[in-house]
Amino acid sequence: MSDYGFANIEEAKADAIFKLNAQYHQDEDPKKVNMSVGAYRDDTGKPWILPAVKKASKIVEEQASFNHEYLPIAGLPRFTKAAAEVLFRPNPHLLSEDRVASMQSVSGTGANFLAASFIETFYVKHTGAHVYISNPTWPVHRTLWEKLGVTVDTYPYWDAKNRSFDYEGMLSTIKSAPEGSIFLLHACAHNPTGIDPTREQWLSIFESLLSRKHLVVFDIAYQGFASGDLNRDSWALNEFVKYNKDFFVCQSFAKNMGLYGERTGCMHYVAKDASTKNKVLSQLCIVQRNTISNPPAYGARIAAEILNSPQLFAEWEQDLKTMSSRIIEMRKRLRDSLVALKTPGSWDHITQQIGMFSFTGLTPAQVQFCQERYHLYFSANGRISMAGLNNSNVEHVAQAFNHAVRELP
């Protein structure tokens, strides 16, 4: 046996979001508000099981064929096919031409891992390409690629001064990055800023990416949740299809179906032809087999039931509108409350942003002030989950922000 002692290793830092969530649950103050975790809550602050999901769960469990057997390595075919169909609704020819390789994944995180692992093996090792992620972005985007040994660079995204999208900064980096770099893009409801490019800006971004022969990976965690419209939220990646270039998409059903703990997702590779698609799919199966072997079944069965039933699909679309409209209303309430309090600065960015998160622009010191004085729990970078707001606490949150901005300008 080796004499190596594990007592000498460094203790890793706790994940910031999960640490905040734990602190919130330990806090006994009745006015505490949890705006850290990206999970939908209803207006009473409770987790919400979508009505369509409730019905689908019942159908799944009452099926005579229901069991707990292993799924195929690539996942539940009924789910992966339907997941691709809902993603590429405006481009059905992709599926009829057999150009989409779809791998069920452990939610969006697993989808990102599958894409990154494949790209590292079959692209980075041959080209030495770096991956470019937005600054800021979901923290796992960086750590996941770094753990695979890929060099991570960033492109500007958030204009802190104007609290808006840094379009020129992003475009400049795309144009100056070495030819054939990898660019990871948020398809909608950018996390954490909530700011998306306009359609005109997307088109310019795509032209620049293609002129530099960059490889594109889309991450779409909020299809339908962002605006309430499935096609609108997937517009960018479907527009990219028109350029006839291969690309990857990381898809999650955690947010838009509320299947957080079921870890239901899919990774899609869009190929130029069926032959390439089959080769890539075969290699993705090797990655899957050597990591998780095969994906979890229950959430996939629920999602498949919804996606393949016209009645449940229509109800799900209504559920999406219910969630997105409440988030939009909370944005308006928070902004209006800050304006009514005459809080210094402009707060229009709150209603200009979209999706689950808002990048408030508060400093780490102001965030800490809000936690200590008002028992608000949210990220040190000022990101809040709008789902944590409701009609009972939005005024309390506005008062905290107002006090923090005045106390610590």
UniProtKB/Swiss-Prot annotation:
Keywords: Acetylation, Aminotransferase, Cytoplasm, Phosphoprotein, Pyridoxal phosphate, Transferase. Its cofactor is pyridoxal 5'-phosphate. It catalyses: L-aspartate + 2-oxoglutarate = oxaloacetate + L-glutamate. GO terms for molecular function: L-aspartate:2-oxoglutarate aminotransferase activity; pyridoxal phosphate binding. The modification Phosphoserine is found at residue 385. The keyword Phosphoprotein applies. The keyword Transferase applies. Its main location: cytoplasm. It comes from the Eukaryota. It is found in: Cytoplasm. L-aspartate binds at residues 38, 138, 191, 383. The modification N6-(pyridoxal phosphate)lysine is found at residue 255. The modification N-acetylserine is found at residue 2. Homodimer. Belongs to the class-I pyridoxal-phosphate-dependent aminotransferase family. Plays a key role in amino acid metabolism. NCBIfam families: PRK09257.1. This is Aspartate aminotransferase, cytoplasmic. It comes from Schizosaccharomyces pombe (strain 972 / ATCC 24843) (Fission yeast).
